[in-house]
């Protein structure tokens, strides 16, 4: 999702640049030899590493080994290939999942490794922490500008709308739409609906990141990127209900995991560099719903 948004924004904002895309169809980025060969052939000035194995709570709970191992392989492969090719600049797309389960809110960048991680996200988070620290070490040891973006949860066009792997907003839109079409009286929500999450529209993030490539030396080692406010799970489902036009209600399965109670970022450091997301939740979810309908 973010990768496709970056490609679209690059064409708009930097049309004169020579952009090389490496998708999973081109190279298995878990394969260190294949990744090394691809980077050596292209010899880029900058790399945006947005590849990751991602999913919702259900998927991470069912396959923790996959989320840890695949992301460790991806990140070590890409970053080591960049180091070997002496690529001067790399932007690593991390995750707010790297922050502790129970700690002060909002999170600041120095809160990394300050307390235990959320158990459901632990495997994925450990891999993303390793990727972030690898960038930090490479920058310190070799003098490269390898920096880490730590976005809040993201939503936007081209998301994964599957109920097994989709993130909250995409899954909510898919479930509410299905209930609307079927005439179901209620939609089931995991947990009690009170857990709070911060979501940023992927196009806003992509546009700003594209503007930053070539200037990552001005960044600290890692930087939070969020909208600065959060909503409860129920509030996101209510927004999906408004966007879809669904008139039914909600049921709650409190036996299912809902993740940590709150995760919100302090993006003050990014604001000093010009970060200022503009898309409201209602506008963003309306665009996502249109994208969902066009994909059906």
Residue map of PLM features:
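Active-site helix of classical SDR
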Residues: 113, 123, 127-130
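Conserved catalytic Lys-bearing alpha helix of Rossmann-like short-chain dehydrogenase/reductases
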Residues: 72-78, 127-135, 169
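NAD(P)H-binding glycine-rich loop region in Rossmannoid oxidoreductase-like domains
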Residues: 32-72, 84
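NAD(P)-dependent short-chain dehydrogenase/reductase
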Residues: 102-111, 136-213, 237-244
């Amino acid at each position: 999702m973010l990768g496709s948004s970056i490609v679209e924004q690059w064409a708009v904002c930097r049309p004169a640049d020579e952009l090389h895309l490496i998708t999973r169809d081109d190279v298995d980025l878990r394969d260190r030899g294949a990744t090394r060969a691809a980077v050596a052939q292209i010899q880029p000035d900058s790399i945006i590493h947005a590849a990751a194995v991602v999913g919702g709570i259900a998927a991470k709970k069912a396959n923790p080994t996959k989320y840890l191992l695949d992301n460790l392989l991806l990140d070590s492969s890409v970053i080591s290939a960049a180091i070997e090719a002496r690529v001067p600049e790399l932007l690593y797309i991390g995750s707010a999942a790297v922050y502790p389960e129970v700690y002060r809110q909002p999170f600041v960048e120095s809160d990394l490794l300050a307390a235990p991680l959320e158990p459901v996200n632990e495997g994925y988070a450990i891999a993303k922490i390793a990727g972030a620290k690898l960038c930090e070490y490479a920058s310190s040891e070799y003098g490269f500008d390898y920096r880490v973006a730590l976005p809040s949860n993201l939503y936007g066009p081209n998301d994964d709308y599957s109920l097994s792997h989709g993130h909250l907003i995409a899954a909510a839109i898919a479930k509410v739409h299905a209930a609307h079409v079927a005439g179901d009286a209620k939609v089931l929500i995991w947990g009690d609906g009170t857990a709070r999450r911060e979501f940023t529209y992927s196009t806003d993030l992509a546009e700003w990141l594209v503007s930053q490539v070539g200037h990552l030396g001005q960044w600290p080692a890692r930087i939070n990127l969020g909208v600065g406010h959060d909503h409860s799970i129920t509030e996101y489902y209510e927004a999906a209900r408004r966007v879809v036009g669904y008139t039914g209600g909600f049921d709650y399965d409190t036996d299912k995991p809902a993740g940590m109670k709150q995760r919100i970022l302090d993006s003050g450091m990014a604001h000093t560099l010009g970060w200022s997301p503009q898309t409201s939740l209602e506008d963003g979810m309306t665009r996502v719903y249109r994208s969902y309908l066009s994909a059906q």
